[in-house]
Amino acid sequence: MSVAKSDKEYVVKVNLKGSRRVSRTIALRGDQTLDDLHEAIFAAFDRFDAHLYSFYFPKAPGRRGTAGPKPKEYTAPQMFDEPDPLDDQSRFDASATKLDDLRLRPGQRFEYLFDFGDSWWHEGTVEAVNPSVPRARYPPIRESRGASPPQYEAVDE
């Protein structure tokens, strides 16, 4: 955890996609990164085995009945270790992206994918943007609803 430096605090509610009964509400400072948000979600959902991840932020909604533009993707820094000739340069490094840089606002939604193999999809909503609390330690978990499902299904031998 780190001590407050940014003047903004972002309160984010994250739930497992398709299950509003399992959610975590987390607060982070504006100078923390999407990688910090990933680490907070990882811990809040009782995960133990690290995997790649990406955040997806819609650029703008499409007109009714049409798809909007491709969302901006912010992904794990490990994805940039080796050049990918097929990369269309549309991905951004989550560890280099501060929450303040995203200009988040209450009600804004995003998606978070953890583990590209098992595809743990989450839905996120910015619940509030508040003044940060001086000398507070971030990221605190403000609310935890429902039990986290196991990261891996039990295998019968």
Language model segments and positions:
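Short linear regulatory motifs enriched in tryptophan with gly/pro/ser
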Residues: 1-157
